[in-house]
Amino acid sequence: MAHAEEPEDRTASTEPVVRPGSLLVSSTDLVEPAFRRTVIYVIEHNDAGSLGVVINRPSETAVHDVLPQWAPLAARPSALYVGGPVKRDAALCLATLRTGAQADGVAGLRRVHGRVVMVDLDSDPEVIAPLVEGVRIFAGYSGWTYGQLDSELQRDDWIVISALASDVVAPARVDVWAQVLRRQPLPLALLATHPIDVERN
């Protein structure tokens, strides 16, 4: 039986607890180039630590150049995204399921949250294709040991927000950082107007 649309497929809000499917949105105080206006999608969060990928850092490398068999399924832009500083030589793939599609029992798919799934890049793209709207492939990931992310949250380095499935495959032309904040209630939504270059003001 097809699952109903999860609430996070229609709306997203701030939440105090990190879980798979959360977004970590960098605060305006994080002005270092590596972290400024970063949005991380959390894939795992447990007693062993946390793992996620940066969803708004496209690289100049085309998916076709590294994993040509997955290029037809890659969401635009069909570029490899920089998921984080850990294991940059390894690839990780997320996808959004088509409405009504099920990942349970499908070899190569593992549900993360809602319509977002992890894809085993060794699986057959032709099997995956009918089930997904698009895939996003990341080089590397962002990781925290147990308690490390909690410390960063206590410093207000990150704002925790529920993700929409569409956030994972947002086009490069979309300012995901601003878009995610803009759909939050006031006063948080006002942060979306924060200038990209603070030196201009």
From Swiss-Prot:
InterPro entries: AlgH-like. Gene3D superfamilies: VC0467-like. One of its GO terms (cellular component) is cytosol. Pfam families: DUF179. Belongs to the UPF0301 (AlgH) family. HAMAP family: UPF0301 (MF_00758). PANTHER family: UNCHARACTERIZED PROTEIN YQGE, UPF0301 PROTEIN YQGE. This is UPF0301 protein RHA1_ro03630.
